[in-house]
Regions:
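Beta/alpha (TIM)-barrel catalytic core signal, keyed to glycine-rich beta->alpha loops juxtaposed to Asp/Glu
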Residues: 144-322
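A short, structured active-site edge motif that brings together acidic residues
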Residues: 89-103
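Conserved, mostly hydrophobic/aromatic
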Residues: 6, 18, 65, 78, ...
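Active-site mouth loops of central-metabolism enzymes
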Residues: 24-48, 107-121, 148-149, 253-256
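Short, well-ordered coil/turn segments that N-cap beta-strands
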Residues: 11-16, 61-64, 87-91, 134-138, ...
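Active-site groove signature of glycoside hydrolases
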Residues: 128-150
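Short, acidic/polar
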Residues: 42-57, 115-132, 179-191, 261-265
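N-terminal binding-site loop/beta-alpha segment at the start of enzyme catalytic domains
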Residues: 1-92
Length: 322
């Protein structure tokens, strides 16, 4: 597995990381979820699934894992896995604050998470994350930051973040929506006491939604780590999705390359020279194994799949939690 540095001064990480959004809670917005999980979505079942993924990922050389306070029990599962293994000290953990999980382990809950980017939420969730992850936490990110949230003008919040940065914690942002580029550029400008506050960004970039690419390239050129999420567009670029199914232009391109569409979608991300890490959101070891083939998959000429950003995000927003 190819290794890189997480930004200017961060730890070494693998170029493919594992995200636990899909397995830390019973409901999410990914394609094919009912078939992937079936009806057994108890906390014990998802813990075992998460541990299997972590074991397989670590054995394959993955050295970055992505969690969040809002991913149900993802941080808890990860901390228990660390304790059970007693090793894996070189696995770098990035987490996020800003959303609180309120789904109550109920797939049908009308609200699964609540967003609040206030200083009090940051302090509370940092304590919660730190209690579980401790010194293994290397990167803490504002979850789904937008310019409209006002967080970048909240001086109390910025001061609280800066206090933790001065203790050696890397700070980053994640962003979402059609205005990702604006958020990245605005966050890049934030300095506290003459020092840039953030050092990384996690954003959506995929063959259906590449609009943030220029801003992400600028951030990378400026020394930031760039982590890419939703490389398979929540399943749309897999064999089960509308854009990756057999017989579609992208499905045909994957077949010609001798890989599954998910592997080719991740390979397309890795081919961008400004990408530090691309996240696998695999829900099973088989999916992870397929995703990891991206690291050895050459990317030739691919069909043009890009949608208008507003259209892409409207489609994503309409997806049900299942």
């Amino acid at each position: 597995m190819e290794m890189v540095t997480l930004g200017r001064d961060g730890p070494p990480v693998s170029r493919i990381g594992l995200g636990l959004a899909a397995t830390g809670r019973p409901a999410y917005i990914t394609t094919h979820r009912d078939a992937d999980f079936g009806s057994d979505r108890t906390e014990d079942a998802l813990r075992q699934r998460t541990w299997q993924l972590l074991d397989a990922a670590y054995a394959a050389g993955v050295r970055y894992v992505d969690v969040a306070r809002s991913y149900g029990s993802a941080e808890l599962f990860l901390s228990q896995w660390f304790a059970a293994r007693g090793d894996a000290d070189d696995l770098v953990v990035g987490s996020k604050w800003g959303y609180t999980y309120v789904g109550g382990w109920d797939v049908a809950a009308p609200v699964q998470e609540v967003k609040d980017l206030s200083p009090s939420t940051f302090e509370r969730q940092y304590r919660e994350t730190n209690a579980l992850i401790g010194d293994r936490l290397r990167l803490y990110q504002v979850h789904s930051l937008t310019v409209e949230s006002g967080a970048l003008e909240n001086t109390a919040l910025l001061a609280a973040l800066a206090a933790h940065r001065s203790n050696g914690l890397l700070l980053g942002i994640t962003t979402t929506g059609p205005a990702q580029a604006d958020t990245v550029r605005r966050a890049f400008e934030v300095h506290i006491d003459g020092v840039q506050l953030f050092s990384s960004v996690q954003a959506t970039w995929n063959l259906l939604e590449p609009s943030a690419g220029p801003a992400l390239e600028e951030a990378h050129s400026g020394g930031w780590a760039v982590l890419v999420k939703e490389a398979v567009a929540n399943g749309r670029l897999t064999r089960y999705g509308d854009a990756g199914a057999p017989g579609t232009p992208f499905g045909n391109a994957a077949a010609a390359a001798g890989v599954e569409p998910d592997a080719l979608a991740l390979a397309a991300v890795l081919a961008q020279p400004w990408v530090t890490v691309v996240l696998s959101g695999a829900a099973s070891v088989d999916q992870l194994t397929s995703n990891l083939r991206a690291g050895e998959t050459p990317v030739g000429v691919l069909p043009s799949l890009a949608e208008p950003a507003a259209q892409y995000w409207a489609t994503r927003s309409a997806r049900p939690w299942t």
